Structures are given as C-alpha cells and as structure tokens.
Design a protein with these regions (language model features):
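Bacterial N-terminal signal peptides that target proteins for export
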Residues: 1-8
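Serine-hydrolase catalytic machinery in alpha/beta-hydrolase-like enzymes
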Residues: 27-110
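N-terminal signal peptide c-region/cleavage motif recognized by signal peptidases
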Residues: 16-18
C-alpha cells in the first residue's frame, strides 16, 4: 500500500471519528506504521455536511494550508489540511522539499 493511500485512509477514518467542537480548530496526529503524521482540522460554526481535504505543496503543511482550512470553515465546510511527509520530516529548503516529495513519487503503484 502506498504512503498516500495509507494517509488518506487514516485521515478519512479520523475525520469520521474525531470529535472537535463546532467553530474550533485542532491539530491532530495519527500513526501509520512507525511514522507519525499530523493534520489540521477546522470546524465550521454549524454542522458541516461536506469535508474538504487540503493537500500541501512541496514545502509541507504550514501556515498557508492552515489559513485556507480556517477560511473554508468560515464558509461552512469542515476542512482538513493533511501532512504527507510526517512530523519528523526536516524541511529547511529546496533540497529537503525535493527529498520528501521524491519519497512520495517513488512510492506509487504502477
């Protein structure tokens, strides 16, 4: 199973079972194998009927994705900004971005 598929399955399960109060935001963590990942969940003020998943750019989950999740929650959506690299990923520049993105590209099924 690919990393991305495992992450998506885990986050869909978390999104279905994680209880976060309406109008609140929370950084959650989850485990796949030996790796720990995080996701930022932004809940709207009223019950959301739709969840939007935000996939980060090659520089990882950061303030940009978090701000977009909050904006979507203000529009009435439950927004989940995913981390595809894991909490231990070191992202200090282009070489790091290339390395972590390469891991995802090399982990795809044919």
């Amino acid at each position: 199973m690919t990393i991305i598929r495992s992450i998506l399955q885990s986050i869909f399960l978390l999104a279905a079972t994680q209880t976060i109060a309406a109008g609140h935001n929370s950084m959650i963590t989850y485990q796949i194998g030996d790796n720990e990942y995080k996701a930022f969940v932004a809940e709207p003020e009223s019950m959301a009927s739709t969840t939007v998943y935000i996939i980060h750019d090659w520089n990882g989950l950061n303030d940009y994705e978090i701000s977009r999740a909050k904006m979507l929650a203000e529009q009435g959506y439950r927004a989940v900004a995913l981390d595809l690299f894991g909490v231990d990923a070191k992202l200090d520049g282009f070489d790091d971005y290339r390395r972590e993105t390469g891991k995802l590209y090399n982990d795809r099924s044919e």
